[in-house]
Amino acid sequence: MNTAKTIDYYNKHAQTFVEGTISVDLGSIYAQFVSRLPDSARILDFGCGSGRDTKYFLSQGYMVDAADGSQELCALASQHAGIPVRHMLFQDLNDVQRYDGIWACSSILHLSRADLKVVLEKMIRALRERGIIYTSFKYGTFE
């Protein structure tokens, strides 16, 4: 997949994307994820999009870092969640043992298979001992 094209798409359609995703109810998935976290967990919302999930985790008392590759989505997510959102590509994750949980909801699916392997390794390095990752992908036979 072409990272520049993907980011350009999200920059051009950020408001429409936010409007289409901000109200999606992920309550049952959130519950499964947070049930495996310590009370004072630090979470990375990796590819935070609208900031919907960041806002939820903050409302539950977690420390949250949010990041996205689209500058436009970073701005909208920051407004919605009320925290600064870091503009970065998935490939630029270099944290080591910083997070108890990494939430990558419908985000890293945009990576090529080769980039996905590298990014998953970086995500694992960014986890503290007993840390967990949530990610979601689309069905398909494409890369």
Regions found by a protein language model. Give the residues of each.
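A short SAM/SAH-binding and catalytic strip from SAM-dependent methyltransferases
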Residues: 101-115
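A short glycine-rich, Lys/Arg-flanked "PGG" loop and its adjoining helix->strand segment in the class I
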Residues: 117-129
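Conserved class I S-adenosyl-L-methionine
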Residues: 1-38, 40-49, 141
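A short acidic, Gly/Pro-enriched loop at the edge of an enzyme's catalytic core
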Residues: 91-102
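Conserved beta-strand signature within the Rossmann-like core of class I S-adenosyl-L-methionine
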Residues: 130-137
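Class I SAM-dependent methyltransferase SAM/SAH-binding core
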Residues: 50-92
